Amino acid sequence: MKTYLAPVNEIEKEWYVVDAENKVLGRLASEIASRLRGKHKPTFSSFIDNGDFIVVTNAEKIALTGKKWDDKTYYRHTGYIGGIKETSAKELLEKHPTDLITKAVRGMLPKNKMGRAQLKKLKVYVGAAHPHAAQQPTVLDI
């Protein structure tokens, strides 16, 4: 008996909306990454993108446990000698509230073309409003 592989044109991608208010960042990000990959579906294959679209609202109200607001640092490099920059989670939330969730989910996805394509299906917004009402997203309680 052969393993069933759904053809790419038959894969139905659903839309989900997640409210991030008072949700712990890592727990929320791991569930989102799993849904973006399609691991919750019985037709999951690691080499086929059959994940769903996820819309995250209230990104500015995400929660971190312990002293992570001050201790957790994000690094980036300018490309120049000695050009490493670091930002705490609190500073990142003030400047770019959506990046906190996006960076957490990106770290949980594959580091290849498919991972980049799956990350494009993640839509993160500040506040409760989002422009994807036409897709009729289902509320996902995590």
UniProtKB/Swiss-Prot annotation:
Q: Which PROSITE patterns match?
A: RIBOSOMAL_L13
Q: Keyword Cell membrane on this protein?
A: no
Classification via SUPFAM superfamilies: Ribosomal protein L13
Gene3D superfamilies, per this entry?
Answer: Ribosomal protein L13 (3.90.1180.10)
| Organism name | Desulfotalea psychrophila (strain LSv54 / DSM 12343)
Cited function: This protein is one of the early assembly proteins of the 50S ribosomal subunit, although it is not seen to bind rRNA by itself. It is important during the early stages of 50S assembly.
Q: Which UniProt keywords apply?
A: Ribonucleoprotein, Ribosomal protein
Q: Which gene encodes it?
A: rplM
Alphabetically, the GO molecular function entries are: mRNA binding; structural constituent of ribosome
Pfam families referenced in this protein's UniProt entry, alphabetically: Ribosomal_L13
Q: Which GO terms describe its cellular component?
A: cytosolic large ribosomal subunit
Source organism, top-level taxon: Bacteria
Q: What name does the UniProt record give this protein?
A: Large ribosomal subunit protein uL13
**Record text on subunit structure and interactions:** Part of the 50S ribosomal subunit.
Q: Which family does it belong to?
A: Belongs to the universal ribosomal protein uL13 family.
A GO BP annotation: translation
Positions in coiled-coil regions = none
